[in-house]
From Swiss-Prot:
Domain of life of the source: Eukaryota
Keyword Transit peptide: no
GO biological process: mRNA processing; RNA splicing; tRNA processing
Location, primary (coarse class): plastid
Compartments in which it is found: Plastid, Chloroplast
The protein's name: Maturase K
Species this protein is from: Platanus occidentalis
Keyword set includes Thylakoid: no
CC per GO annotation: chloroplast
Source organism phylogeny: Eukaryota, Viridiplantae, Streptophyta, Embryophyta, Tracheophyta
GO molecular function: RNA binding
Pfam family, one: Intron_maturas2
Length: 512
């Protein structure tokens, strides 16, 4: 945001809606270049990100001029197969325009966010900024604190628009620049299979690297609109207000939307505000999959279910079937979420109480939030990546002839450490040890295959210590902080550990 403010000297009161001329500015594509290099630096090598040096604003200017001269903005269903828009430089043109357009179309949202932050600071309200809120594992900490007090949960698959024009019309309330909206229509017609990009069952990673930022913006904006009802109802309900609410919504640009829905939907939703009078109502989402948990009754959950279906259909023209929302009782249901199976289990315990000469034994059941690794889907992901077969038997992976042993070991070790780091919150470590065993033996088979030997002969010749270095147990890492001699540390090794530096789901763990 500081970069945008430095480059863009825009009068917010009059010029923030005129975005189309910015397509012809050199610094827009410089920003797009910087964002493309920084977006996945923690997970992908720099050489895999890449950037086409032939892309420049000069090509964009010539391309847009040619597009208007040949009247390519008018696209009908009859000539969709003979679209001259792409020409012979389809990848270059679409990548360059979409990267710049993705930067530009975010400007109104960023400016509204800054205005909201400045307004809150002027009123003396403190905005809590913490990078820990970005961590996926922070969701499990929230669930561990809240779900043990709730009874029912609804699994919700957020619907996707059936026509691209719906998304354009919704975006029109934020961006009032007609040429920019026409250009958006052009992109959506160009990517005719765009609806598959925001299907809830698909991962964000399916977006092509060339247009990832553009489609990520469309996806996040679509989700933001679908969730707007929760923002309004939570603000209106006196029982659901909290000081941390604004901090949690900081990165999703809900500040302007909160004020907007208070004005627009006040009259329409006043009669249904009683639905959220229960203070034990919580909503969690990642990508297109979300959960709505409550301490209420099945009748209340069913009313929420049909209300959401009608709301999405009436206000956003999103076709959603009631069968896409499943209501389950937490005591006998596991949430398949973010690579974990989460559930609330009763942990029985016996408490003895002595009063004078009488001894009383009381059976007490305490609710406990439990997370385990779904071993079968994870083995399926490993089999798909050619680390093992479908039954979990490790196999060797084909490698390049010029790959060194250290490169192969580093690759397997990095995958093993990432999985161990991500699944450190599992309450049962046996499944995690099995995954480590598969990766370890697959690495040994790969090295033996390269040297045209057997695994036993290879390890006997070089020593089993060759593979010990990178398969570091979680306990060994924790021992650097907590000494093993203390009894609390031994219990710590068996407990769930949540890290606050994980900002996306592991690719192998994303088996949905």
């Amino acid at each position: 945001m500081e970069e945008l403010q430095g480059y863009l000297e825009i009068d917010r009161s009059r010029q923030q809606d005129f975005l189309y001329p910015l397509l012809f500015q050199e610094y827009i594509y410089a920003l797009a270049h910087d964002h493309s290099l920084n977006r996945s630096i923690l997970y992908e090598p720099m050489e895999n990100l890449g950037y086409d040096n032939k892309s420049s604003s000069l090509i964009v200017k010539r391309f847009i001029t040619r597009m208007y001269q040949q009247n390519h903005l008018i696209i009908s269903a009859n000539d969709s197969n003979q679209n001259k828009f792409v020409g012979h430089n389809k990848n270059l043109d679409s990548q360059t325009i979409s990267e710049g357009f993705a930067i530009i179309v975010e400007i109104p949202f960023s400016l509204r966010l800054v205005s909201s932050l400045e307004g809150l600071e002027g009123k003396g309200k403190e905005i809590v900024k913490s990078r820990n809120l970005r961590s996926i594992h922070s969701i499990f900490s929230f669930l561990e604190d809240k779900l043990s007090h709730l009874n029912y949960v609804s699994d919700i698959l957020i619907p996707h628009p059936i026509h691209p024009e719906i998304l354009v019309q919704v975006l029109r309330s934020w961006v009032q620049d007609a040429p920019s909206l026409h250009l958006l229509r052009l992109f959506l017609h160009e990517y005719r299979n765009w609806t598959s990009l925001i299907t809830p069952k698909k991962s964000i990673s399916i977006f092509s690297k060339e247009n990832q930022r553009f489609f990520l913006f469309l996806y996040n904006f679509h989700i933001c609109e679908c969730e707007s009802i929760f923002v309004f109802l939570r603000k209106q309900s006196s029982h659901l207000r909290s000081t941390s609410f604004r901090a949690l919504l900081e990165r999703t640009h809900f500040y302007g939307k909160m004020e907007h829905f208070v004005v627009v939907f006040r009259n329409n939703f006043q009669t249904i505000l009683w639905l959220v009078k229960d203070p034990f109502m919580h909503y969690v989402r990642y990508q297109g999959k979300s959960f709505l948990a409550s301490k209420g009754t099945p009748l209340l959950m069913n009313k929420w279910k049909y209300y959401l279906v009608n709301f999405w259909q009436y206000y956003f023209y999103l076709w959603s079937q009631p069968s896409r929302i499943h209501i389950n009782q937490l005591s006998n249901h596991s949430l398949d979420f973010l690579g974990y199976l989460s559930s609330v289990r009763l942990n029985p315990s016996v408490v003895s109480s002595q009063m004078l000469e009488n001894l009383y034994l009381m059976d007490i059941a305490i609710k406990k939030f439990d997370t385990i690794i779904p071993i079968i889907p994870l083995i399926g992901s490993l089999a798909k990546a050619k680390f093992c077969n479908v039954s979990g038997h490790p196999v060797s992976k084909p490698v390049r002839a010029d790959s060194s042993d250290s490169d192969i070991i580093d690759r397997f070790g990095r995958i093993c450490k990432n999985l161990s780091h991500y699944h450190s919150g599992s309450s049962k470590k046996k499944s995690l040890y099995r995954i480590k065993y598969i990766l370890r033996l697959s690495c040994a088979r790969t090295l033996a295959r390269k040297h045209k030997s057997t695994v036993r002969a290879f390890l006997k010749r070089l020593g089993s210590e060759l593979l010990e270095e990178f398969f570091t147990e979680e306990e060994q890492v924790l021992s650097l902080i907590f000494p093993r001699t203390s009894s609390p540390s031994r219990r710590l090794y068996r407990k769930q550990i949540w890290y606050l530096d994980i900002i996306r789901i592991n690719d192998l763990a994303n088996h949905e």
